[in-house]
Regions:
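Conserved N-terminal entry element of GNAT/NAT acetyltransferase domains
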Residues: 1-39
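Conserved donor-binding loop and adjoining core beta-sheet/short helix segment
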Residues: 64-71, 77-112, 118-128, 132-142, ...
Length: 307
């Protein structure tokens, strides 16, 4: 494990967070959302790399390097970084990186050069019909001090703020119809709890078209029969009650991002789970969300407020 780099000077960060890179104000907390790249804001990128590595290590993942910056952040046509900036404290609350489907390059074999390409296989149907209208999201993080379990009300809105940013992207890029991303579970999470969550997601959100498939699908440790007996209800709501109760019995909670995605859209598609051996063996579940099928209250909150 390398020692994490020291914080980047606030003056250097502010110099790179220029008005032309500001996307919007957030609905809550009066924070600001910026979009940068490694090329136009190298100091902000270093600070993102530092904060990501701290957050992911604390959860049981991470690269083990002094900061989490990889070739997808730094390549010639890199992922863009969407960050939430607290102008009062002059610090980054959290962020995502993203790539527009129309900006995706392909390798010599015709496979898309995506941060998830080493874990998932993308069907021709996905590449032709979905990818050009998709934003791929990754490396979602909330800075440790702003995580709601630690920060109380200060952290409550960090994820909410991030989604204001994603909502704004769909407005400034109206051709975007889908978000493709991953839900991450950590090896430290209770194994039976993980199996229950993944079984529940598969039961209610399974993608039957096999648009995207894990190259090495994760095998659950709990028997299918046991999970089928447990989640025996007809509706998402009833099964969700069971899931929540059972996870709490284990002394755990459903991870916040898993909860958040499930409540975003009833038509979310789940593509199965792969182990990310390059990132602390975390378990990544691929998901696709259609922008126009995001539940109305969420759409009003994160998208309409920007129009």
């Amino acid at each position: 494990m390398e020692e994490i780099i020291k914080p980047v000077s606030k003056e250097l960060l502010k110099a790179e967070l220029t008005e032309d890179r500001r996307l919007r104000m957030t609905n809550k907390s009066n924070n600001q959302i910026y979009i940068i790249t490694h090329q136009n804001a190298p100091n902000v990128m270093r600070e993102i790399g530092r904060l990501r590595e701290i957050a992911f290590r604390a959860a049981g993942g991470g690269t083990g390097l002094s900061m989490d910056i990889d070739e997808y952040d730094t390549m010639e046509h890199p992922y863009k970084q969407l960050i939430v900036w607290n102008p009062e404290a002059e610090e980054i609350l959290g962020g995502y990186r993203y790539l527009l489907g129309t900006d995706v390059r392909f390798d010599e074999a015709g496979a898309p050069i995506l941060a998830t390409s080493h874990m998932f296989h993308f069907s021709d149907a996905f590449i032709k019909e979905y990818l050009p209208q998709t934003i791929e999201l990754g490396r979602s993080f909330v800075t440790l001090e702003y995580q709601s379990t630690r920060a109380g009300s200060k952290g409550l809105f960090a994820l909410d703020n991030l989604w204001d940013g994603l909502g704004a992207l769909t407005v400034v890029m109206p051709n975007v119809k889908y978000f493709f991303g991953k839900v991450t579970m950590y090896p430290s999470y209770h194994r039976r709890g993980r199996d229950m969550i993944l079984y529940f997601l598969k039961k209610h959100f399974n993608d039957r078209e096999e648009l995207v498939t894990p190259m090495e699908p994760l095998i659950l440790e709990t028997s299918d029969e046991e999970l089928r007996t447990l989640f025996c209800k007809d509706t998402f709501k009833e099964d969700y009650k069971i899931l929540n109760t059972e996870i709490r019995k284990l002394g755990y909670n459903i991870p916040p991002l898993v909860n958040a995605y499930m409540s975003l859209s009833p038509t979310m598609r789940m593509f199965g789970t792969a182990i990310n051996y390059e990132f602390g063996d975390v378990e990544e579940t691929g998901i696709l969300i259609a922008v126009d099928e995001i539940l109305e209250d969420k759409r009003i909150r994160h998208i309409q407020t920007f129009i």
